[in-house]
Amino acid sequence: MYKNIEKQVSLKLKNLVDYQKGQVVSKTLVQNEQLSMTIFSFDKGEEISTHASGGDAMVTVLEGTGRFTVNGEVFILSEGETLIMPKDIPHAVYGEEQFKMQLTVSF
């Protein structure tokens, strides 16, 4: 079930979170045993350090440019680009500039 989002309206996901100086901001839209969906904003230079997920993680950049390091390989993604980070593989996210992304994890 979706939460923290209006239903039956047209919207832009990137407008669900604002930038905050020196922070990573997140808003969870779905969280259950099978699926997690979260919208993030990263201020320039902010990061989520290396970690692994218990499910396959798909990120789509909604605005700006982010750097994703997956098992040592670097990917620079811009608005509209998507990357799947496999389950149990170390990955990290870094704000090359202010950017927003949607993260969907399937367990």
Predicted regions span which residues?
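Conserved short histidine dyad/triad with adjacent acidic residue
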Residues: 22-23, 36-53
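Glycine- and acidic-residue-biased ligand/ion/polar-headgroup-sensing regions
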Residues: 55-67, 71
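A cytosolic small-molecule/anion-sensing beta-strand core signal
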Residues: 62-63, 78-79, 97
